[in-house]
């Protein structure tokens, strides 16, 4: 996965590949993790000859809703050093409780519902995430634009044990007074979610 957002993995690993070299082996590798994109402050680091380029664990305590930047520096057996471009991963809700309540229709309804929520935003948010869970299948649209590229979300779950949720970065899709053409104090947004039965109830 490249720059994943909103996952709650118990174990997080980083992998790397060195290209455009005739060297045959890694002599040293260093992994750096920071909360800052410029790595001006290092939160955690690990260095050694035997770091696993296929999957090296990031062994530090992570917080919910947090973006961590990762950089790898590799020195090969010819003395050449390569530094990766910064990558990142962002944690999800983790153990944070859900504040919302389930939204549904009447039990006897047989149609596929469409739920709509209008909300206003003044200033551009520093970041905005949509954390969404649906029993069955869902598709979300923000201001008429489909959220994400996935289809048939949230995929298969064992509903007796868990419900999957997805995380979407919607920062650039939210209308605000900074990117809204009309002279208003707030900009109105609309979130629309359509639901289908999926694996949860009935056949595909």
Predicted regions: what is each one?
Residues 11-15:
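A short beta-strand segment in extracellular, disulfide-stabilized domains
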Residues 17-22:
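Acidic, Ser/Thr
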């Amino acid at each position: 996965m490249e720059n994943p957002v909103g996952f709650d993995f118990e174990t997080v690993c980083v992998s790397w590949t060195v290209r455009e070299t005739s060297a045959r082996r890694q002599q040293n590798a260093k992994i750096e993790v920071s909360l800052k994109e410029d790595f001006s402050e290092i939160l955690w680091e690990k260095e050694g000859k035997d770091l696993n380029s296929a999957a090296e664990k990031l062994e530090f305590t992570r917080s919910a809703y947090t973006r961590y930047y990762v950089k790898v520096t590799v020195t090969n057996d010819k003395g050449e050093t390569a530094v990766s471009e910064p990558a990142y991963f962002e944690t999800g809700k983790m153990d944070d409780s859900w504040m919302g309540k389930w939204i549904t229709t009447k039990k006897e309804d047989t149609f596929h519902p469409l739920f709509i929520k209008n909300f206003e935003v003044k200033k551009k948010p520093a970041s905005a995430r949509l954390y969404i869970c649906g029993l069955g299948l869902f598709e979300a649209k923000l201001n008429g634009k489909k959220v994400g590229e996935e289809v048939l979300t949230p995929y298969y779950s064992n509903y007796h044990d868990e419900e999957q949720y997805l995380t979407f970065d919607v920062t650039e899709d939210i209308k605000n007074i900074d990117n809204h053409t009309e002279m208003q104090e707030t900009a109105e947004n609309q979130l629309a979610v359509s639901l289908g039965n999926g694996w949860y109830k009935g056949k595909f």
